[in-house]
């Protein structure tokens, strides 16, 4: 059946939109390469990395939803609790957040310590989450031929978010961190956790949702 409206947008159209944003932000970073600080380049590069991360989770090879929903014990991992609509909102909202943060940094002329801290934690949480999911799925599917802890999103989590996190850690060297910096970091992380993930997922999770995933991507090879 041909998808229309929001169902069409939530299929993969929104991913193409994110990729356009990534290309534009890449151009902006290159144009300001000799002007922007390392910290600002990384904050802006998160806008580029999220679409790449989504491409790995959804398309090449795809199937992140299967490991995510399976981890939370779902009997319907193709649709519950994560569906196409909720994950679209999660990733689009996170991208918009980092566009806003990049704009704030450009206006201020610097990246605040709070923003650095929040982004560092966010980056390393991606590492932890994908490692935990990877181990879980390895244990679950090793009898069916799975031999690694790889899961959709792992490559961009390890070689994208983790690398960015390490670079930003070096940027903290010699700087004094105040309680106000941790508060700012906490606000950013709360927006990501609550606003981008928990609210859309909890509001939209339905076992009879029309926004189900049509295949399990990478995991289909183990489910035959």
Q: Can you annotate each of these PLM segments?
A:
Residues 54-69, 128-138, 200-207:
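Membrane-water interface of transmembrane alpha-helices
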């Amino acid at each position: 059946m041909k998808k229309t409206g929001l169902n069409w947008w939530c299929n993969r159209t929104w991913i193409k939109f994110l990729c356009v944003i990534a290309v534009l932000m890449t151009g902006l970073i290159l144009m300001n390469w000799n002007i922007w600080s390392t910290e600002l380049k990384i904050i802006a590069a998160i806008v580029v990395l999220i679409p790449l991360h989504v491409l790995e989770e959804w398309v090449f090879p795809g199937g992140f939803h299967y490991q995510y929903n399976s981890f939370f014990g779902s009997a319907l991992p193709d649709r519950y609790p994560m569906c196409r609509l909720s994950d679209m909102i999660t990733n689009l909202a996170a991208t918009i957040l980092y566009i806003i943060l990049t704009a704030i940094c450009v206006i201020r002329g610097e990246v605040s310590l709070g923003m650095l801290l929040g982004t560092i934690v966010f980056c390393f949480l991606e590492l932890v989450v994908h490692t935990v999911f990877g181990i879980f799925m390895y244990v679950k599917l090793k009898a069916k031929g799975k031999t690694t802890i790889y899961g959709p999103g792992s490559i961009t989590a390890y070689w994208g978010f983790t690398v960015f996190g390490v670079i930003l850690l070096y940027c903290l060297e010699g700087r004094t961190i105040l309680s106000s910096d941790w508060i700012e970091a906490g606000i950013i992380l709360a927006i990501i956790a609550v606003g981008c993930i928990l609210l859309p997922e909890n509001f939209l999770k339905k076992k009879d949702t029309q926004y189900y995933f049509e295949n399990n991507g990478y995991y289909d090879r183990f489910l035959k």
